[in-house]
Each structure stands twice: as C-alpha cells, then as structure tokens.
Amino acid sequence: MLRSLVGSEMCIRDSFMAKSGFSGKNILINLIVTIVAGFIYFYVELPPINLHSAAFYSFFLFLSVVYCITAVITSGIYRQAENGKTFWKLLKGSCIVPLIVIGAVFVIYVVGGLLSSVVIRSGAYAKLITVETGDFTQDIEEISFDQIPMLDRDSAEKLGDRKLGELADMVSQFEVADNYTQINYKGRPVRVTPLRYGDIFKWLNNRSAGLPAYLIIDMVTQEVDVVRLPEGMHYTTAEHFSRNLYRHLRFQYPTYIFNEPTFEIDEEGTPYWVCPRIVKRIGLFGGTDIQGAVLVNAITGESQYYTDIPTWVDGVYSAEIIMDQYDYYGTYQGGFINSLFGQKNVTVTTEGYNYIAANDDVYVYTGVTSAGSDESNIGFILTNQRTKQTTFYSIAGAEEFSAMNSAEGVVQHLNYSATFPLLLNISNQPTYFMALKDYAGLVKMYAMVNVQQYNIVETGQTVAQCEENYRKTLLNNGIIDSTDAEVPAEEQELWEKK
C-alpha cells in the first residue's frame, strides 16, 4: 500500500509539472532567454543597480515579464488552458517566482514613493539646502569690463559653428557638440565644448584616432580657440559601444546614479567629463542631491570618484537641482499645509537663471519672488556650483523678464530681443546687464536696467558706452554722486584699445 501511495504521489507531481511546464529543461531555457534579454536591456538602457532609482525597478519588471512570456511559450500552457481561470492557474505554476518579484517590486515602489512624499516629509525637503544671507555691495564687487561675459549660450553656439566651418580639415568629418559648459579657465569666463562625429560613417572612419579637438569660446572677447589634442578624445557622449561615456560609467560604477555629465578642462587644458553622483536624501526616491563626482579623462577613459571636488572643477550642482532645492526651502519652511493655505513667507525662484564668475568659481544666479507670482522680485540667490554654498540677497526690484521687456521697449523700433540678464554691481547699484539681438540672433547693442527702479534703462553700442550712459542716468536721478558716475580711467583705456 505504501508503494502504491508513493507511486500515486509521483504521478500527480509529474502530471502537474507536465501541465504547468515546471520542468528542469524548460526552467533552464527560460533562465537563459531572460539572462540574454536582461543583458541586452542593461547594455542599451544602462539602469543603475540601486534601490533609489526608478530605472532599477523597471529593469526587474522587464526581467520578470520576459521570464513569464518565455515560460508561457516553452510550457505550452496557452494550448492547454481551457479558459482564463485554468490559464492563470497554470501560469502561476510556471511563473510563481517572477510573479512574486513583480508584486514585491510594486509594493516597494509604492511604499517608497509614499515615504518620499513631500506631503509627509516637507520638513526634510526644506532642509536640503542651507541658505545664508548676504550684503550685495560687500559680497558682489564691481568687476572690470574685461571680466563681463557678453556672450550668451546661443551666441557662443553660432561662433563655434562658424569657427568649425573655417577648418577645412575638420568640417567634413566633425560637428560641434552642444555642451558649451561655462567655466572659469585661467581666470577668464569661457565656454568649452568638444567636437562630435558627423554621422555613424564618419565615426567608423575616425574612431581609432578619436575626436581631435575641442573649442574654447571667450565670453568677453568673443574669440574662439580650437585646441588640437596630441591624442584624440576616445570617451565622449558621441562614442558608441564600450567607449560611450554613459556605458563606460555604468560598467565601472554599476550602483551609482549619475546626473548629466558636463564637459570641462583643467588648468593644463586636459579635457574631462565631470559626472555628478546623485543620491536620494529622503526615503527611496525623494530629496535629489549630489554627493561627489566621478572625473573621467576624455582621452584615456581613466576615472576617479571624488567626494572632495578639485578646485578647478566648476560645475557639479546643476542649475535645475539648485533651483528645485531652493523652491523646497522657500515653499516648505512653514510646513506643507502653509504652502497651500495662507502661504506665509512662501517664496520660489523665478523661471530663468544665469551664471556669474567670481573667485575662480561659477555661481548660479536666479531671482526669488513671492508665491503670488507677481512681476517683482524680493531678492535673488547666488549658489556655488562646486560646493552648493548658497547666499540670499534681499533686494526688492524688477523680475528678470520685466527688465528684459523694459530694455526691449527702449529699442522697440529696431525689434531687438533681450537675452536673459546677468546681475552686476554698478556703482553699488544692483543692475541687470543684457545683450540686445536682431532677428538673426546677432548682438547689436547692450542694455543696463536698474533692479530696484526698472524704469531706469540705458543702452549702448558697446559695453563701455552702455555703462557710461547708465552711470550718467543714475547721477541725473540722484541715485549716485558725481564720483560714482565716472567710469574708472583704467577701464576706459582698456576698452578704447579694444
């Protein structure tokens, strides 16, 4: 009788395994297909193996779905199932593990999202950034004309494309990449950008030598320098396969979440990719912040992770992360309920931003306005892109776009458009400085608008002329005295030589 019972049990088990496809051979096939598909997915999509990344959960869901689809095919349960109920029963028998994984991933994702929610963690979001207060006239020094960056990004791109067009040995094979990172290089505000391959065929022709040069655009003199490299850049965002920068990073740092890499050069002119490491400070998915950066040599591919960023690096914290963190700070200082009702002391950043070079670093500048979203600012912030040191300056005045409209109104007969302003200290007066462009995007004039009294606007064909006119207008309105109204002689002489 015992043998009969054992035999019956084995028959039932074999029958279930046959019906459900739960056999060693089928499982092996399912696993092989899933592993191959997973490797292809990982190679193409490059998800970080990190619980704080949504892409990681998508990767696991993809693997589970592939396994289930393969199991349905290899087991033949789609032929055996008489109805939906039977199909689901057989599917559970073949895919119990991946189905559990899908359920677990869903639960973790939902719970993690709730624990990261600003609704219940508003206080933590408000503490992501530390904001100090500063004095504008003491902290922001007047800078000489040869330090004022007159080029915006669009103008720099036009100059870069024009320069490449002059190089007969490069223009047929390469294009200018659209990085144009603003940095301080040897005490000068410049934008730097590498070349990229014109297309896949030009990549095939030139990949062994790499990208031969990068461009430096001086934002003051508007000069473009093509820096030819003794050895080409082999690791860039324009590369393919293992030399693609994103793939190179992922296989070297599989658990790191990276922000968008930026192209920079050190003081010797060696090209690097600065790859900020993203961490989540709040729950699983909330409180995006930066914790160090990986520096990748664009020529050799050598990389190193730094928690203490070298001083020559300028861009670690992106403007978007800085503005998001300040918006959390300004919005949730009084709690989540206050951000919706009452909105006492609730402030947010304005829509635009710009960069200011100071003390061999690059700072993000943006205005701060009240939650009412009127056309005036209550002040502005400056944030060091390398250290995230943030200072708020309480200066009530015109919002940047209002200042742009004021400048455009002065030259409305010419139909010029204003660039997003740069904040300067002119005679201890916070002043918006901007270029005025024609319909073709060429800079034709310059304008200065007083932040606190944006009806005070002056323009000029040159920066020197613009500032001279602006100082005279400040004098005529009793804002400054005659001593401050004069442009320093050494600066006047400098620009006359130019």
Feature names for model-found ranges:
Residues 1-14:
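Single conserved hydrophobic/aromatic residue that forms the stacking wall/gate
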Residues 20-498:
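Soluble extracytoplasmic regions of secretory-pathway and membrane proteins
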